[in-house]
């Protein structure tokens, strides 16, 4: 069974690099306070690492 990660956006995407905005979109995050559940895969962990300064992981 694959474990799920709860990801919450805690900072705005306004003024961020296009690469960061695309990564937020890839995770399915749209606005501050938005929380999504994603599978704990290497690709998702890489996206989280790139955006660690604007996400909260539970």
Swiss-Prot record:
SUPFAM superfamilies per the record? Ribosomal protein L30p/L7e
For this chain's UniProt record, which GO biological process terms are given?
Answer: translation
Keyword annotations from UniProtKB, A to Z: Ribonucleoprotein, Ribosomal protein
Note one Pfam family from the annotation.
Ribosomal_L30
- Can you name a GO cellular component term? cytosolic large ribosomal subunit
The record's GO molecular-function terms, alphabetically, read: structural constituent of ribosome
Q: Which domain of life is it from?
A: Bacteria
Similarity comment text for this entry: Belongs to the universal ribosomal protein uL30 family.
Q: Can you state the subunit structure given in the record?
A: Part of the 50S ribosomal subunit.
Which NCBIfam families does the record cross-reference, listed alphabetically?
rpmD_bact
HAMAP family recorded: Ribosomal_uL30_B
Q: What is this protein called?
A: Large ribosomal subunit protein uL30
Q: Which organism is it from?
A: Buchnera aphidicola subsp. Baizongia pistaciae (strain Bp)
- Gene designation per UniProt: rpmD
């Amino acid at each position: 069974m694959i474990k799920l990660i709860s990801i919450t956006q805690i900072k705005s995407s306004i003024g961020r690099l296009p690469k960061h905005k695309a990564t937020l979109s890839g995770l399915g995050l749209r606005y501050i306070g938005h929380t999504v559940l994603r599978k704990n895969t290497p690709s998702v962990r890489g996206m989280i690492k790139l955006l660690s300064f604007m996400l909260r992981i539970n």
